[in-house]
Amino acid sequence: MAAAGARRSPGRGLGLRGRPRLGFHPGPPPPPPPPLLLLFLLLLPPPPLLAGATAAAASREPDSPCRLKTVTVSTLPALRESDIGWSGARTGAAAGAGAGTGAGAGAAAAAASAASPGSAGSAGTAAESRLLLFVRNELPGRIAVQDDLDNTELPFFTLEMSGTAADISLVHWRQQWLENGTLYFHVSMSSSGQLAQATAPTLQEPSEIVEEQMHILHISVMGGLIALLLLLLVFTVALYAQRRWQKRRRIPQKSASTEATHEIHYIPSVLLGPQARESFRSSRLQTHNSVIGVPIRETPILDDYDYEEEEEPPRRANHVSREDEFGSQMTHALDSLGRPGEEKVEFEKKAAAEATQETVESLMQKFKESFRANTPVEIGQLQPASRSSTSAGKRKRRNKSRGGISFGRTKGTSGSEADDETQLTFYTEQYRSRRRSKGLLKSPVNKTALTLIAVSSCILAMVCGNQMSCPLTVKVTLHVPEHFIADGSSFVVSEGSYLDISDWLNPAKLSLYYQINATSPWVRDLCGQRTTDACEQLCDPDTGECSCHEGYAPDPVHRHLCVRSDWGQSEGPWPYTTLERGYDLVTGEQAPEKILRSTFSLGQGLWLPVSKSFVVPPVELSINPLASCKTDVLVTEDPADVREEAMLSTYFETINDLLSSFGPVRDCSRNNGGCTRNFKCVSDRQVDSSGCVCPEELKPMKDGSGCYDHSKGIDCSDGFNGGCEQLCLQQTLPLPYDTTSSTIFMFCGCVEEYKLAPDGKSCLMLSDVCEGPKCLKPDSKFNDTLFGEMLHGYNNRTQHVNQGQVFQMTFRENNFIKDFPQLADGLLVIPLPVEEQCRGVLSEPLPDLQLLTGDIRYDEAMGYPMVQQWRVRSNLYRVKLSTITLSAGFTNVLKILTKESSRDELLSFIQHYGSHYIAEALYGSELTCIIHFPSKKVQQQLWLQYQKETTELGSKKELKSMPFITYLSGLLTAQMLSDDQLISGVEIRCEEKGRCPSTCHLCRRPGKEQLSPTPVLLEINRVVPLYTLIQDNGTKEAFKNALMSSYWCSGKGDVIDDWCRCDLSAFDASGLPNCSPLPQPVLRLSPTVEPSSTVVSLEWVDVQPAIGTKVSDYILQHKKVDEYTDTDLYTGEFLSFADDLLSGLGTSCVAAGRSHGEVPEVSIYSVIFKCLEPDGLYKFTLYAVDTRGRHSELSTVTLRTACPLVDDNKAEEIADKIYNLYNGYTSGKEQQTAYNTLMEVSASMLFRVQHHYNSHYEKFGDFVWRSEDELGPRKAHLILRRLERVSSHCSSLLRSAYIQSRVDTIPYLFCRSEEVRPAGMVWYSILKDTKITCEEKMVSMARNTYGETKGR
């Protein structure tokens, strides 16, 4: 598919590249010196000539000769003329029969005969929606095909005509439906006579004639002024030549020191000090917008040498924005490294002096040695040059620097020939001096004369550029649905143009022709029409067959691709562990999940610090060990660019496909491929594999002699005899799940007269071993479980004590404490004072956060659900480690670990022993009870009732000793329910750690008392990392790295600064690194701001960890739904927290805030919605977006807003007014007054009016009956129908005895970002680093208070 996306040149020798720029775009001239300002103003045309490439290009300035006109041509008229339907198009027609005229008729017939069999045999129903096309463009300009329409849209043509107004008026196009079922579209040039006959004169022609006359006059004036200016310049130059010719004629001489200084012009950055590199890098950084990567050029050290930039300025300008946008971490191509071309050929012809040769060789030697010493070096990419090829489909390659990969080909050489070229070339003074003409007389023209000449040349070029005529070009763009064009469709382009299918995702088999002019015969481009399988290297223009360069062979499956057949002395494992899969940083999708093919030079190599192996860099690849860009990949490719350059390079789907192209790594057909013991021979190449691999679930031994199961045995080759005291034995056993493979089982043994001890590693003398009833029993008073957690490892991430014992448990010292047996040595146990024992603590009532997210049942009359915690601690002991003695098992494992240990070995150690050990902890017993209240109102009423009933009567009013939890438990047990059923929704959930002593009355329970219970671990006060027990600094650093990887990168990547560099295996299905997962944010109602009828405040805790994933933005979605079972057909409104809310670009109804939680490092973001509808069901959704474009899982809050506000006093007044109007005889005017009054109030107010009317005047008749009697059935129905809008929840609240209105004023932090994010950024910025200014404001929230009695 990638090869189908490349744009190709249609004819032999046609090499147009890129999209042609239609329209004339003169730039502003450079500012001249003040003496020439008047003359410069005279030469300028009166109006400014600006011809930008805008959408309204047809409205050019009148003095500009260029015009740009865009015409859209619909295919609907041609389709209507046909006798077939839209969905049943015939596909068995020829593609060009009858369309060509003159010399092209024969070629059209040939196209028809070639296309008819393929198109008639379209497969099944897919061919019914396809259409044969025949597009012919006789004018210069390309034909583009884009499948950007839906299947229900009609195709159409777009013509972009660029040229003079007269030329554009001669462009003619027509479309028709041919008899054979082909849609024919033809663009041609009409003559002036035909145009005059076919087109009536318009009102614009006289004005254009006047403009043409003024244009000729302007040209004449300009020509005269230019001639005068040139005459003055010649006279000035002659005067200066006469005056200064005799003054300075001596030849400048140079000293030996100067020549030595100029001996070498460029020194690679590796030979510079780190300060010099950083200073030069910072100076270059000021001219770029990218915060990720900065291009670094080699540093010139000449003082009097004029350094010339040899890059192509237009090409560089076109791509600077893309490089800054993608934040490329690779450097640009260096002018001083490996530049092919004429300078290199000339340099190789002329040999330098012997001293110069020695200097260069010494520099090269130092340069290579610095690589071997892991010195950070940057190797620049090669400048790609145009290469000659016999393939008519290949064009010049655009010089880009994307992600540090550049597929440059030297002129006249193939990919294999580039392997032998020298990568580094140093230019010496002897070579550079050819440009300066040593020994000649100094020019007599000084700076003033040069300035005059430069300014005159600029003015002359500008004036001549203004008068240049614009050639006529017509770009034809065909917009079609996907899978629309049938096989056999034909395209005819003029010579110098091409067919652009770069955006065509599903190309068909085409016939492509080109012609020199309208009457010349058509020439078929067999190479250009290979859209689905374009040739990778060479293409025969006569037959269209693909071939390969020397050293390459056609792929056995895909014949249009080439694989390398000659690799020289390439043996051993593939070393590129740092090349990872590319992905699209913009969309966050795997586009493409490719590994690019490169050519390699075996003559050079370098050491990569990150891979710990010697690698051979590709010719076109820049390996930059200094790159510390915060991205998980070193290769990033844009999908469009990959398709465009498929002719110069191809790719493989996976890295295994790339490695397989190198051929087998071993011959496994005989002698197990040379693999020893139980290694298995694998002929396929793999990353960092020599072909000898271990069976599944086994790992190699330390010395690499065999494979063993590290979970069931020891390693005798670890350098410490496997931890055995005497013998370490090995045994080869077959694997139970694979009889063809085996494992090496290793265990400890003892020599004669010794026996293996119970620990399995040490040995005991047989004379010291006592067995039988006569032997003394060991002392059973030792307690090896009390405070045992202090001797084991602890995982600080999972908060669990591990099974592995770190410290040895001995009982040599008399370590006793009251009521306990002898304790292990090294434990210091301190009982806490009596005042801290048996203390009950009741927390403040807080909103239940677990019930403020998801599907929320909120009652504004009762308030938030609340929660309180009751905790009692007793039998408390503070335990510390006074002295430590490492256990034998832990000591043996530490001996095995080295700085070369793999991350998996260290992670296995952490999994068994943990990451820390406990240095200080609190032991005892604890009773914790959580009290859940259904609402805030219930909690307040129960607390008031508790205070009232547990207080003695009298003036002192001292509280009794009964705790609140005991009082509530008594209510729940005895079911002492009050009139308002307060206790019905209260729940108490308790959890006990250890046993409560009988001396504590707050936690003891009948029948479960214990005088001196065993204390358990309650709280860990201080932990110490295990790596502090490691002596070797290298091993300690490796353990730290593995520990950080397990903490932040899931053990599948390395921590670099504050981000994770994922392994090759830590990529998800979409190609994005997932070793540092993006947590799910939890959206909830703000616990401090309860919702009202129109205002809802939401908040969430920032999920960005300290290391790893970086959150770029949070996306909020809110919509109003009818029921909880929403079908999600209405998506609602999406808001970006960073771009819409913090920037202030959103609506005034939504505001953003930010605050800090109990821990300052934790940020809490909040959003307040102000313009919601009362009694409406709303659904709010939140997800996070990281800097790679990944989305987290959704968090949802569904909530019904509070009931509408009502004025109870006004409702009662309206009820009285309606009663007075209904009372007695009701005239027509009174009826209308009553009707208008009831229709003007809201539905909730009408419900409240009905409540007051019935409560006061129901004895005179119900409100419904009285309204029907007084107003009539029709008007009464219109009024009473509005009561149906009130929900059942609000109708129950509106029946309350009293409703009071109040306004709560709540402080809220309104935040705005100080910086503006630039539009179209590819690299997402980090939200936490955004500078935010917050201002505290008061938010007024009107509420209703419902009750059975009037509030105070």
From Swiss-Prot:
It comes from Mus musculus. GO terms for cellular component: cell cortex; cell pole; clathrin-coated vesicle; early endosome; endosome; late endosome; membrane; perikaryon. The C-terminal region after the fibronectin type-III domain presents structural similarity to annexin domains and binds calcium ions. This is Astrotactin-2. Residues 1-31, 308-327, 375-421 are annotated as: Disordered. Belongs to the astrotactin family. The chain crosses the membrane at residues 219-239, 448-468. Glycans are attached at N180, N796, N1033. One of its GO terms (biological process) is negative regulation of protein localization to cell surface. Mediates recycling of the neuronal cell adhesion molecule ASTN1 to the anterior pole of the cell membrane in migrating neurons. Promotes ASTN1 internalization and intracellular transport of endocytosed ASTN1. Selectively binds inositol-4,5-bisphosphate, inositol-3,4,5-trisphosphate and inositol-1,3,4,5-tetrakisphosphate, suggesting it is recruited to membranes that contain lipids with a phosphoinositide headgroup. Residues 523-563, 664-708, 712-764 form the EGF-like domain. Residues 1079-1201 form the Fibronectin type-III domain. GO terms for molecular function: calcium ion binding; inositol 1,3,4,5 tetrakisphosphate binding. Keywords: Calcium, Cytoplasm, Cytoplasmic vesicle, Disulfide bond, EGF-like domain, Endosome, Glycoprotein, Membrane, Metal-binding, Protein transport, Repeat, Signal, Transmembrane, Transmembrane helix, Transport. Disulfide bonds join C527-C539, C535-C546, C548-C562, C668-C681, C675-C692, C694-C707, C716-C728, C724-C748, C750-C763, C838-C1000, C929-C990, C996-C1003, C1049-C1060, C1062-C1075, C1149-C1171, C1203-C1290, C1311-C1334. Residues 240-447 are cytoplasmic. It is a multi-pass membrane protein. Residues 52-218, 469-1352 are lumenal. Pfam families: Annexin_2, ASTN1_2_fn3, ASTN_1_2_N, ASTN_2_hairpin, MACPF. The lineage of its organism: Eukaryota, Metazoa, Chordata, Craniata, Vertebrata. Residues 383-392 have a biased composition (Polar residues). Interacts with ASTN1; the interaction is not calcium-dependent.
